Amino acid sequence: MACAGLLTVCLLGPPAPQQPRHSAPAAGHALFQDVFRRADKNDDGKLSFEEFQNYFADGVLSSAELRELFSGIDDHLTDNLETEKLCDYFSTHLGVYRPVLAALESLNRAVLTAMDTTKLEYEQASKVDQFVTRFLLRETVNQLQALQTSLEGASDTLEAQAHGQRLDEETIKAQSRPCGSRRAGRRALRSISWSPSWSPGSSDTGRSSEAEQQWRLQVNRLQELIDQLECKAPRLEPTHEEDLTKGFDSHILVAQRQVQVAEDALQDFHRALCCYMNFTGAQSHCLHVSAQKMLDNAAFTLYEFWQDEASWRRHQQSPCSKAFQRTLIDHLQAPDTLTTVFFPASWWIMNNN
């Protein structure tokens, strides 16, 4: 009996060691990886202090303070900070934004799934189903834009308070001195558009710069799909020897913007361009908006047709237009060229066929 028991023990052997369980990635980890990958210009998985400073400089922290922060995260003092360490550092400081970033990651997956399905099924769907799809996309965009506006308002307010001065004063100073960091350049073009009722002590949505970027990314993706689903075409027909009348509505304004996009930023720029064109085309005083891309390079020409100059100038101050101008700062190889010209309003004939 003892031999049988010993034989059983030998056959069974010791229990297999349990495999260690890998914990799920922390909320926002994937988002941070994507963000810091863009900051890593040479794609070596690390940030030098120069790369760190170029990306994080906001005009508030001094270079010495940024160096102190960099050294505090880079505990080995290698002067090359691994992006994973940056992810871990910010993950420990998420606070109330932990569920926000987790929701953004879930939203990103859900939107991509919905868009892929829409691209496959839209053309074969009935007219009613196509109408419903466009309606749902528009409403989704509206909800995201509302959240984005709240985030941008909070962001602008906090940055203004951090500088201890009004944003319009910051804009004037930024225009009168050499351009600093990428983020400082963005502020120089940002309009005074925050909600006046929001303050850091209020209970409304707070600031999360990465959350703001993700909301804008989702809006751009949805707007790009809407732009693919709907299209209108204009034509101009001049009359001969026409007697022109004077007045604010006697001429239309055509604005031409020429841009040269960096090759590695084409995808992000195209999304932002589609978002801007969709928003602009929906304005009541905008007659038409269209864009052309050169086949042999990354050059684009954007055309906007407006009922009058005043409407176009008001549009230039809108949050969407300001966001597009910030995109130009980030993604262009050289400053854009903007030209405006007036045409007799009677030349404009809209082709609805």
Swiss-Prot record:
One of its GO terms (biological process) is protein metabolic process. It holds the Pfam family ABM. Phosphorylated by NEK2. Keywords: Calcium, Golgi apparatus, Metal-binding, Phosphoprotein. Residues 253-342 form the ABM domain. It is found in: Golgi apparatus. GO terms for cellular component: cytoplasm; endoplasmic reticulum; endoplasmic reticulum membrane; Golgi cis cisterna. Inhibits the interaction of APBA2 with amyloid-beta precursor protein (APP), and hence allows formation of amyloid-beta. May enhance the activity of HIF1A and thus promote glycolysis under normoxic conditions; the function requires its ABM domain and may implicate the stabilization of the interaction between HIF1AN and APBA3. This is N-terminal EF-hand calcium-binding protein 3. It comes from Mus musculus. The gene is Necab3.
